Amino acid sequence: MIDKSKKTIRILFPQWQGGNQELYGFGARLLHWLSPESCSSLHTISVPEFNPDTPEPEEGLLYRRQLLSQHDEAWAVLEKEEPDHIVVFGGDCLVDQAPFAWMNTRHNGEMGVLWIDSHADVKTPRDFTNGHTMVLGNLLGGGDPEFASKVKTPVAPSRVMYAGLIEEGLTEQESSVISDLGLQIARPEELYENSDRITRWIKEQNICKLAVHLDLDVLNPDVFRSLLFAEPEPEFDWQAVYPVGKLNLAQTLRVIRDVSAETEIVIIGITEHLPWDAWNLKELLKKLPIMNE
């Protein structure tokens, strides 16, 4: 049942700079188009067109100034609207920083975070130049120092749980952060049949408000193709270097529905949607004879 006393907003955040990939913006817009109609207001964050000529990193981070500007624009929307619930259509994973940080401050640092992702997202600029690999680290007070300074109330480590994380793919730095902070992990294999590992954590931590980060790369690329790791004929073999997701759509939906029965979900951020087939068809259509008349 919809609680009409709650104010929900939608944020369309077609950010691509955090992953340096053009399809992130296209994927965000397609996500919004695919979503059910809603009376909620839509707020679109201004994002420049993709730059095919990758610049030098700025203090270790690609497109640092643009990413900070977009973060601040999203924060300004939240400050003005003061929503109870937020839906985010991304975009790379970094789009979730401003909404998660803002909502955690609103709830006095007591918000829980369910990070549904095959990757840890706790790197630093010393480890990588793409900002989307640092977003959870930023929210915890680590990651990139400048982005972390934007987080008024860091998320408490005990109130964070990974769902679907592939531990075999963790770097030494990522493993160290997870171990040092004591971050909880529900492995893919623990989620194939039920969500008990996560619902127990919600009860143990007495989490009344929960933000859900859904990185679509938690899905198995053999069953869901709109992912970085399902790129047709890739120039770079992503699957040979980075861990790929193991869940399917039904399992992922069941996890989210199960946790929503235990607590109030205040944010759902959906990220990393790379619809290769739709993009390639779009590129074909614009090159056909008489199509542009």
Residue ranges and their predicted role:
Residues 123, 168-170, 276:
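Active-site environment of divalent metal-dependent phosphoester hydrolases
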Residues 150-185:
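Hydrophobic, aromatic-enriched interface-forming segments
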Residues 124-127, 147-150, 171-178, 223-225:
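A short secondary-structure junction signal
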Residues 2-88, 95-109, 177-293:
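Catalytic cores of soluble, metal-dependent hydrolases
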Residues 119-120, 166-168, 216-219:
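Short glycine-enriched loops at secondary-structure junctions
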Residues 85-159:
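Active-site histidine-anchored catalytic micro-motif
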